[in-house]
């Protein structure tokens, strides 16, 4: 009897236990993870130092020159001849400490922008392909989806020609494909000829304003986009087309693809952001698609579909909240990869344009002076890269464990 009473009390204790959300439980597990807390502290210090330096510590890289103080070792105490240089100076007499701190802002910008590009484009594509692979869309859902898809794809020729209206033209092509499919049932096969030709002509004519080579490139891009938009949206066809494009991008080594994109666009921090963001799109697309396809097989999603809930309600109420955990973890680790990729591009001279401070560019400018004993010119930018990447990776590992529903107590 006593054993039975003990079990009953345990059930009662469980019944009256305070309800806790997934996010509260995740936060408690995160702060209990010492490794994750180390990563969180490193990330917070990195964010605070980069933000403070950018907004409250003015720095003009073009005027930060002192040829009489070239390659000085770290100096902690000022003298009559030399000022304080905590990290020493580089080949032009520039203070490495200030450049390292301000370079953190550029690395932070690259990480945030690149991950945002990858997450928004890849996440939306993965969400839509996974959700609508087995669910039929009505006319207005197809109309809105194809309009947005045409607009997104049209941003590529619009960016090449610097003419924003091209994105609007391809949005109209996407919307027109749905109308064509709905109201011209007897001529559906002709869309395979009409829309690719329309996309090629519109893109090529707009590209002629810039030059013949740009018109040729835009014509080919417009042809491919028009062919893609001519396909009926929904079902496995839409998913297969998007995923095969993602597979093609993944077939290239990420660093080589980023270098090729930057070489085509030209050097610069903004071009590096775009290149790193484009390379990361397939990762988020595949992750979001697999997560969505797993969630859509759950009983609560099938039940909501059975009772007639709208697709948008199912998508935003049942599916999207339940796929955020792996995406948040991937985005956190993606920040580390973006910072590392930006440093690699900067080291090769394809990132920030000198004299803009950036950790990879600082390494590329200073590694040749190691043989002369100027170790500080390489050590501190390298440590900054290592610590920031390590911090985001440790935090990402901790978030992955904290957000795992299998270990929720």
Residue ranges and their predicted role:
Residues 1-224, 228-231, 237, 255, ...:
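Gly/Trp-centered helix-boundary motif
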Residues 46, 127, 259, 263, ...:
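Transmembrane alpha-helix boundary and packing residues in multipass membrane permease domains
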Residues 105-121, 267, 293, 312-344, ...:
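Transmembrane alpha-helices
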Residues 237-244, 256, 269-273, 315, ...:
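The feature captures the transmembrane alpha-helix scaffold of multi-pass secondary transporters
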Residues 245, 251, 258-265, 274-284, ...:
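Hydrophobic transmembrane alpha-helices
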Residues 250, 261-266, 276-277, 290-292, ...:
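Glycine-rich helix-loop "coupling/hinge" segments at transmembrane-helix boundaries
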Residues 290-300, 399-401, 405-406:
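Transmembrane helix boundary and interhelical loop/hinge segments in multi-pass membrane proteins
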């Amino acid at each position: 009897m006593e054993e039975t009473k003990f079990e009953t009390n345990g059930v009662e204790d469980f019944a009256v236990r305070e309800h806790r959300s997934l996010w509260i439980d995740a936060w408690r597990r995160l702060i209990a993870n010492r490794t994750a807390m180390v990563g969180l502290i490193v990330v917070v210090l990195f964010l605070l130092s980069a933000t403070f330096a950018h907004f409250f510590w003015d720095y003009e890289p073009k005027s930060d020159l002192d040829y009489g103080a070239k390659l000085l070792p770290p100096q902690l105490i000022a003298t009559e001849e030399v000022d304080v240089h905590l990290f020493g100076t580089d080949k032009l007499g520039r203070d490495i400490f200030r450049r390292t701190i301000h370079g953190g802002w550029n690395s932070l910008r690259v990480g945030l922008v690149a991950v945002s590009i990858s997450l928004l484009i890849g996440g939306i594509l993965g969400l839509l392909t996974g959700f609508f692979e087995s669910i039929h869309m009505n006319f207005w859902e197809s109309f809105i989806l194809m309009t947005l898809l045409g607009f997104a794809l049209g941003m590529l020729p619009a960016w090449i020609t610097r003419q924003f209206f091209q994105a609007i033209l391809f949005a109209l092509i996407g919307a027109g494909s749905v109308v064509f499919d709905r109201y011209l049932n007897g001529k559906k096969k002709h869309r395979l000829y009409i829309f690719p030709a329309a996309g090629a002509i519109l893109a090529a004519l707009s590209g002629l304003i810039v030059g013949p080579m740009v018109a040729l490139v835009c014509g080919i891009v417009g042809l491919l986009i028009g062919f893609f938009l001519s396909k009926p949206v929904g079902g496995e066809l839409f998913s297969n087309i998007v995923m095969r494009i993602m597979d093609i991008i993944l077939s290239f080594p990420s660093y080589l693809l980023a270098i090729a994109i930057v070489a085509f666009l030209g050097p610069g921090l903004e071009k590096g952001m775009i290149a790193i963001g484009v390379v990361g799109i397939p990762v988020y697309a595949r992750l979001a698609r697999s997560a969505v396809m797993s969630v859509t097989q759950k009983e609560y999603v099938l039940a909501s579909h059975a009772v007639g809930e709208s697709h948008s309600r199912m998508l935003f109420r049942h599916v999207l909240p339940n796929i955020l955990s792996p995406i948040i973890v991937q985005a956190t680790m993606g920040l580390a990869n973006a910072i590392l990729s930006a440093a690699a591009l900067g080291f090769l001279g394809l990132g920030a344009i000198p004299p803009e401070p950036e950790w990879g560019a600082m390494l590329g400018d200073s590694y040749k002076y190691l043989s002369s004993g100027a170790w500080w010119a390489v050590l501190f930018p390298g440590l900054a890269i290592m610590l920031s990447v390590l911090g985001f990776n440790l935090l990402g590992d901790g978030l992955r464990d904290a957000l795992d529903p299998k270990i929720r107590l």
